[in-house]
Curated annotation (Swiss-Prot):
Disulphide bridges: none
UniProt keyword list: ATP-binding, Chaperone, Endoplasmic reticulum, Glycoprotein, Hydrolase, Nucleotide-binding, Signal
Catalysed reaction, written as an equation: ATP + H2O = ADP + phosphate + H(+)
Example of a GO cellular component annotation carried by this entry: endoplasmic reticulum chaperone complex
A Pfam cross-reference name: HSP70
Disordered, as annotated region: 784-848
Motif stretch (Prevents secretion from ER): 845-848
Record's compositionally biased regions (Polar residues): 807-822, 829-840
Predominant location category: endoplasmic reticulum
Glycosylated sites: N134, N247, N359, N457, N462, N488, N555, N632, N678, N733, N817
Entry protein name: Heat shock protein 70 homolog lhs1
Signal peptide: 1-21
Species per Swiss-Prot/TrEMBL record: Schizosaccharomyces pombe (strain 972 / ATCC 24843)
Length: 848
């Protein structure tokens, strides 16, 4: 098999690779918890945080009227509305309708949740939310994915289309297909389905180097839904990446084992049963059909389990569990371990299965790397330590995040968006695919532990007994997954004119998803002699083999047409309907969020308005109508908000907000203007006075032409005169503007909008200061000295001064302060009394 070099990021940040780079989102959809990791070009890998900044979210969706709730809040809602809190649905992925054993087990744990048949989906089941509303298993999973995608898009500031999904190693094709269809409902592209344990191995390898001799480790994943173990081989091989030869780390999954007997949920069920029996023994009340009480016991069992992972005892306490009776029970770690005594064998069962399939012994295993939330439970760790010795137990990966991080790195390697370090990753299928030839006869289409992408050939003998258009059912882990049909056998038989005919079919699996892929079907003819007409050139060309000139063909092969139909796959129409249903639900969520946001903003504004009503100084700037709105309408709107706000249209909420907000803004504008006006006016007058001082003392220096260059003297005087005129015109216009408007402004009432605004004063003062500074620069500029006869051209060039550029570090205030105190005092007389004489001087400056 030709191996492709897959690449994993080791850099502290991702490197931009091409112009159309896109983000990759890895989702670890777990039975109890979901995690997600985002890789975007230009930023390092990040765990996607929830709305509450948690690094993981419960895999739950709840419905409360038109409201859809996710995560911990959705799980907590089960104590009030147990029928509408959908959780732990990953346990149902291997179902084939309501008769499935898994469905029966699920409904015994969550009796309030109602399930119905759904023939349009792979899973075959839907959750009933109301008489008018139900959602398929695929749609429920898609909702959680969509929730995390929206969180990731907020982080990435862009749309996300590429996903990588983790799957337990024991997931068969049916379970994988359900996850893929959930992503298809969202119109997302799944780059890969990666084994949880292989993803952990990738994360484990990033900070380590390996020799050329294989090192064998076991990734042991004990989660909420199952416990699995995968034997992983780590070594270094020679290879090339980006055209360069280098040593490359290789990660190969060799074999896996699993059990459903040991999991976080199974331990929860033990605790729930123990607490339920304790309550019955003490009070004689059976809680088996009390849905709310069972949901509360479930929540408390989860809390107690977490406490006992770190402490020797915990107190289970639930107020008014049933019939007004409080429940309180002390549970020790030893009690929990006695409840789980029958799980000890299950703890090591996956390891034994994996080692047996890999043909390895414990002595060849370097370490057992623990992963998964349940791996923290002390009795699981102690059981493993007793079985394989404690020195081989390794806890050096993040038990919650290693899988999703490894999956994100793997996804980055499958795109062109990232510059990455090379790594060879080889995943395997964990159940054989069987091709049924009859009621009791079958052949292995793909053996167990076959690496992804590897081809496997099967041969069907006795061609004459299979018919003209034979169909062969295909199964994986006991579940029928599809039908393989040969189409043109009769035509091929005419070409293959020999007595010993066989049919060879080639199968493989998708290189990144582990899904079965039929490759080809051929008819072989061993030592057959062709009829004369097929010696001429019209014969069907063979795919393999060779021929000789005598007309005999050894191992001749002829292609056969085939079709492969997957069972239970959602039709395009069903996918469109599911996508439309989720889009409608998303729009309802957005409308609800917009409504809630409008209510919150109105409530905040009402509190502010009510505070302003008691501020007499603030109310001086309100006119009678505005005062009425503040005092009356704000109170009325508050009462309306409490009584009718949640049921009212969003438009009515925003209208009330706008009316009150506009009123407050108008009053606040006048209030702020009045507070800042005197300071701004004083600054403006000071700018006028400085300008007047410079303009009043304007003179034209006498530059002797026997000393200075005559042409440059004219240039300097012209620049100075132009600057003087610009400053003078600005001064004259601003002085006149202030004279025309100041009295009117000062006579307006506080409840009227000001005639002169603070922003105008500040802008005019700024412009005056800029022109004053420019004039000072021109005043300090000197003409060139007259060149001496015989002076070198280089000295003349060195003395050249740029026409429009004069570099001087003098600040405007420094230059202005250099004006004599006497001149400054003269200029402080009335600012509005001199413009006429100054204007005449400004006009005269044109003659300079």
């Amino acid at each position: 098999m030709k191996r492709s070099v897959l690449t994993i990021i080791l850099f502290f940040s991702c490197q931009f690779w091409h112009a159309f780079a896109s983000s990759v989102l890895a989702i670890d959809y777990g039975t109890e918890w979901t995690k997600a990791a985002l890789i975007k070009p230009g930023i390092p890998l990040e765990i996607v945080l929830t709305k509450d900044t948690r690094r993981k979210e419960q895999s739950a969706v709840a419905f409360k009227g038109n409201e859809r709730i996710f995560g911990v809040d959705a799980s907590n809602l089960a104590t009030r509305f147990p029928a509408h809190s959908i959780r732990n649905v990953k346990e149902l992925l291997d179902t084939a309708g309501l008769e499935s054993v898994l469905v029966q087990k699920y409904q015994s744990s969550y009796p309030a949740i109602q399930l119905v048949e759904n023939e349009e989906t792979t899973s075959g089941i839907s959750f009933v939310i109301s008489d008018e509303e139900n959602y398929s298993l695929e749609e429920i999973i898609a909702m959680t994915m969509e929730h995390y995608i929206s969180l990731a898009e907020e982080m990435a500031h862009e749309k996300i289309t590429d996903l990588v999904l983790t799957v337990p190693p024991h997931f068969n094709e049916l379970q994988r297909s359900i996850l893929l269809e959930a992503a298809r409902i969202l119109n997302k592209h799944v780059l890969a389905l990666i084994d949880d344990n292989v993803a952990v191995a990738i994360e484990y390898s990033l900070s380590r180097s390996f020799s050329t001799d294989p090192t064998y480790n076991i990734i042991y994943d004990s989660g909420s839904g199952s416990t699995s173990a995968t034997v992983i081989s780590f070594d270094t091989v020679e290879g090339s990446s980006l055209g360069k030869k280098q040593n490359i780390t290789r990660i190969r999954a060799l074999a896996s084992g699993f059990t459903l007997k040991l999991s976080g949920n199974e331990i929860n069920r033990k605790l729930i049963g123990f607490m339920k029996n304790s309550f019955y023994q003490k009070h004689g009340i059976d809680l088996s059909h009390n849905h709310r009480a069972l949901a509360r016991l479930e929540k408390e069992a989860l809390r107690v389990k977490h406490i006992l992972s770190a402490n020797s005892e915990a107190i289970a306490s639930i107020e008014e569990l049933a019939d007004g009776i409080d429940f309180r029970l002390k549970i020790t770690r030893s009690v929990l371990e006695s409840l789980c005594k029958d799980m000890e064998d299950a703890a090591v069962e996956p390891i034994n299965k994996a080692l047996k399939k890999a043909n390895l012994t414990f002595s060849e295993i370097n370490s057992i790397i623990l992963f998964g939330g349940a791996s923290r439970i002390p009795f699981i760790q102690s059981t493993l330590a007793d079985y394989v010795s404690s020195d081989k137990i390794s806890k050096n990966v993040n038990a919650d995040e290693a899988s999703v991080k490894g999956a994100a790195f793997y996804g980055a390697s499958l795109t062109k968006s990232f510059r990455v370090k090379p790594l060879i990753v080889q995943d395997i299928i964990n159940y054989p695919y069987l091709l049924s030839l009859g009621t009791s006869e079958y052949i292995v289409a793909l053996p167990d532990s076959t690496p992804y992408g590897m081809q496997h050939n099967v041969t069907i003998h006795n061609v004459s007994t299979i018919g003209k258009h034979p169909s062969f059912p295909l199964s994986n882990n006991g579940e029928l997954i599809g039908e393989f049909t040969l189409s043109n056998i009769t035509d091929v038989e005419k070409v293959c004119a020999c007595s010993n005919k066989n049919i060879q079919i080639s199968f493989s699996s998708d290189r990144t998803k582990g899904i079965l892929v039929p490759l080809s079907a051929i008819m072989t003819c061993e030592h057959g002699e062709l009829s004369s007409k097929h010696k001429l050139g019209d014969r069907v060309k063979s795919l393999f083999g060779s021929h000789d000139e005598s007309g005999l063909r050894n191992n001749e092969s002829y292609p056969i047409g085939f079709t492969y139909k997957k069972y239970g796959e959602m039709s395009d129409n069903a996918l469109r309907l599911a996508s439309a249903k989720l889009e409608r639900r998303l729009q309802i969520d957005k409308s609800k969020a917009a409504h809630d946001n409008a209510l919150n903003e109105l409530e905040t504004l009402l509190y502010r308005a009510q505070a302003m009503v008691d501020d007499d100084e603030f109310l001086e700037f309100a006119n009678p109508e505005e005062t009425k709105i503040l005092k009356n309408d704000s109170v009325e709107s508050y009462d309306w908000l409490i009584e009718y706000g949640s049921q009212s249209p969003t438009s009515e909420v925003t209208d009330r907000y706008k009316k009150l907000d506009d009123t407050l803004k108008s009053i606040s504008f006048r209030f702020d203007q009045a507070k800042q006006f005197n300071t701004s006016l004083e600054n403006f007058k000071n700018a006028l006075e400085r300008a007047e001082s410079l303009l009043t003392n304007f003179d034209v220096p006498d530059y002797p032409l026997n000393v200075y260059d005559e042409k440059d003297v004219k240039r300097v005087n012209s620049l100075r005169g132009t600057s003087y005129k610009k400053l003078g015109n600005q001064y004259y216009n601003d002085t006149q503007w202030l004279k025309d408007n100041l009295d009117s402004h000062l006579s307006h009432t506080l409840s009227e909008d000001p005639l002169i605004k603070v922003e105008e004063l500040e802008e005019k003062a700024k412009r005056l200061q800029e022109l004053t500074y420019e004039y000072l620069r021109r005043s300090l500029q000197q003409p060139k000295l007259k060149a001496k006869k015989g002076a070198s051209s280089s000295s003349t060039a060195e003395s050249k001064v740029e026409d429009e550029t004069f570099t001087n570090d003098i600040e405007p205030t420094t230059a202005l302060n250099s004006t004599s105190t006497q001149e400054t005092e003269k200029s402080r007389a009335s600012v509005t009394q001199r413009p006429s004489s100054l204007q005449q001087e400004i006009d005269d400056s044109d003659e300079l």
